């Protein structure tokens, strides 16, 4: 099944600058599965360790990263336990900015 994943607020740099990805994922996959799948398949090898540290902390999304599932805060949807559905749009937006 297909889902769309989008990155903003600088997170796209960990994913080789690509802000939008359309992914085929197995039915029954959770957001937790998706997080690890993205690190392994969307992050370039030479950026994986640094990118993982920007994106994840303790095997979940790092504090300061807003996650929206179909424009709804992921906390309302079960966070990383949410089971992905066909045509879901998952947005990861960093709320931390340097300055």
UniProtKB/Swiss-Prot annotation:
Pathway(s) it belongs to: tRNA modification; 5-methoxycarbonylmethyl-2-thiouridine-tRNA biosynthesis
Cross-linked sites for Glycyl lysine isopeptide (Gly-Lys) (interchain with K-? in acceptor proteins): 99
GO molecular function: protein tag activity
Modified residues annotated as 1-thioglycine in this record: 99
Post-translational modification: C-terminal thiocarboxylation occurs in 2 steps, it is first acyl-adenylated (-COAMP) via the hesA/moeB/thiF part of UBA4, then thiocarboxylated (-COSH) via the rhodanese domain of UBA4.
UniProt xrefs under SUPFAM superfamilies: MoaD/ThiS
Keyword Iron tagged: no
Principal location listed in the UniProt entry: cytoplasm
Cellular localisation: Cytoplasm
Protein name: Ubiquitin-related modifier 1
Gene field: URM1
